[in-house]
Swiss-Prot record:
Residues 23-50 form a propeptide. This is Polygalacturonase. GO terms for molecular function: polygalacturonase activity. It comes from Chamaecyparis obtusa (Hinoki false-cypress). The keyword Signal applies.
């Protein structure tokens, strides 16, 4: 009894000390040290004091007026909670478990103190009635944040059912939707060092999770789901952003599981399960004659189940720019339509799109260890531009058959590249290439290879280099000696076929075809 009384008195004394020092940050630092020293002698008090000390960084939305019944509008309470948490380092804005909070569209804006977390353990629901929706294309927007975490074991539900029913109709056998007013569920803009993990996102009126102009983002363990026929309900969309790492996500929606738009680079996707949906899409790129750039996308270990597309690159006619250094490997297709698809004639118009000569250049695309079943006869479709052909297309150990077990087909148009290992079905325009090991080495920077094809120069003084965008020149070299074998450096910023289409003899600055 005496020991318990003494412990209680000691704890009360500590509380008084904490209150007295609360206004002095330097005193607080010294106090923390004193508390730690004292608590080493009493473990039970240490646990209690630390629980209260840590609780000071948690901002529970209920404490700021939010009502967890799913009916009362908690928008203002969420905004107030954010404003308080934003000012404190390592703060946690908590949406508690076993509660449902109704929130209208809201912007959570920074900059904030570092290590801020928005932790959703309960459920957040949107306004389900389009007629009552406030004028905004985004439901929950996060902007101008650094070192920010959006996480939790809870659910963010866009309640998009009424939006889908009222905004779409079938025209000439195609579903056409009015997307002008349908909101995106979550958008993160102009932010760095962001982590999004473990949440369940569902039933967004339109896209579920969109990133714009972000850098250094990790997405892990998300579950994103919407009905197969829900229109334009992309899982994750990335625009004008770089350095993304996406892993261990399960996505099934009515549109792209993951879409990568222009201005994006260094995107890694690992251990993805996709389906239903439209697969992983790069694009669409080059719409309305615009310039587009996407580079260094790596997909490793993915499974596509009953998807409308698998690995898709889509560009509009009339655009310009470059999509390059794209690698897909270790992918399984299960009854997926269009498992491998490059479509440079992408068109969503109800009528046919006009043919145009310019196009986004597609270079250096690798498909490695892709296997499974296709729901469409053409398991591989490489439909490249007539005026700007695809170059550096590389297929290694690809085996796809129809779900019925019958052979599938490959349709390739203006696709230049090679295959190695197994290729089922065969593609008529691809030629045999290097071994898988050589194939891997080619992708590395400053790789040196022996080559003596396709160029010539005067006498023995020969300098050969690769040209990333040489003009069309069909004149063969005349009156010159064949070039001696040279060491060719394959640069990562100049994607080429293993046997490049054109060479430069720099001693007299002429370009030749092999």
């Amino acid at each position: 009894m005496g020991m318990k009384f003494m412990a209680a008195v000691a704890f009360l004394a500590l509380q008084l000390i904490v209150m007295a020092a609360a206004e002095d940050q330097s005193a607080q630092i010294m106090l923390d040290s004193d508390i730690e020293q004292y608590l080493r002698s009493n473990r039970s008090l240490k646990k209690l004091v630390h629980s209260r000390h840590d609780a000071a960084t948690v901002f529970n939305v209920e404490q700021y007026g939010a009502v967890g019944d799913g009916k009362h509008d908690s928008t203002e309470a969420f905004a107030t909670t954010w404003n308080a948490a934003c000012k404190k380092a390592s703060a946690v804005l908590l949406v508690p478990a076993n509660k449902k909070f109704f929130v209208n569209n809201l912007v959570f804006r920074g900059p904030c103190q570092p290590h801020l977390s928005f932790k959703v353990d309960g459920t957040i629901v949107a306004q389900p009635d389009p007629a009552r929706w406030k004028n905004s294309k985004i439901w929950l927007q996060f902007a101008q944040l650094t070192d920010f975490n959006l996480m939790g074991t809870g659910v963010i539900d866009g309640q998009g059912q009424q939006w889908w029913a009222g905004q779409c109709k079938v025209v000439n056998g195609r579903t056409v939707c009015n997307d002008r007013n349908r909101p995106t569920a979550i958008k993160i803009d102009y932010s760095k060092s962001v982590t999004v993990k473990e949440l369940t996102l569902m039933n967004s009126p339109e896209f579920h999770l969109v990133f714009g102009e972000c850098e250094g983002v990790k997405i892990q363990g998300l579950k994103i789901k919407a009905p197969r026929d829900s229109p334009n309900t992309d899982g994750i969309d990335i625009f004008a952003s770089k350095r993304f790492h996406i892993e261990k996500c399960v996505i099934g929606t009515g549109d792209d599981c993951i879409a990568i738009g222009t201005g994006s680079s260094n995107i890694t996707i690992k251990d993805l399960i996709c389906g239903p949906g439209h697969g992983i899409s790069i694009g669409s790129l080059g719409r309305d004659n615009s310039r587009a750039e996407v580079s260094h996308v790596h997909v490793n270990r993915a499974k596509f189940i009953d998807t409308q597309n698998g690995l898709r690159i889509k560009t509009w006619q009339g655009g310009s720019g470059l999509a390059s250094y794209i690698t897909y490997e270790n992918v399984e297709m299960i009854n997926s339509e269009n498992p491998i698809l490059i479509n440079q004639f992408y068109c969503t118009s109800a009528s046919a799109c006009q043919n145009q000569r310019s196009a986004v250049q597609i270079q250096g695309v690798t498909y490695k260890n892709i296997h499974g079943t296709s729901a469409t006869a053409a398991a591989i479709q490489l439909m490249c531009s007539d005026s700007v052909p695809c170059t550096g297309i590389q297929l290694s150990n690809v085996s796809l058959k129809l779900t019925s077990g019958k052979p599938a087909s490959c349709v390739d148009k203006n696709a230049r590249g090679f295959y190695s290992g197994r290729l089922i079905p065969t593609c008529k325009n691809l030629r045999p290439g290097p071994s898988p090991k050589e194939f891997e080495l080619q992708q590395q920077p400053t790789t040196v290879m022996d080559e003596n094809k396709g160029a010539c120069a005067k006498g023995d003084s020969t300098c050969i280099s690769l040209s990333s965008s040489p003009p069309n020149c069909k004149n063969k070299c005349k009156g010159c000696q064949p070039c001696k074998p040279k060491l060719i450096i394959v640069h990562p910023n100049k994607p080429q076929d293993y046997y490049p289409q054109k060479w430069v003899c720099s001693c007299h600055n002429k370009i030749y075809n092999p």
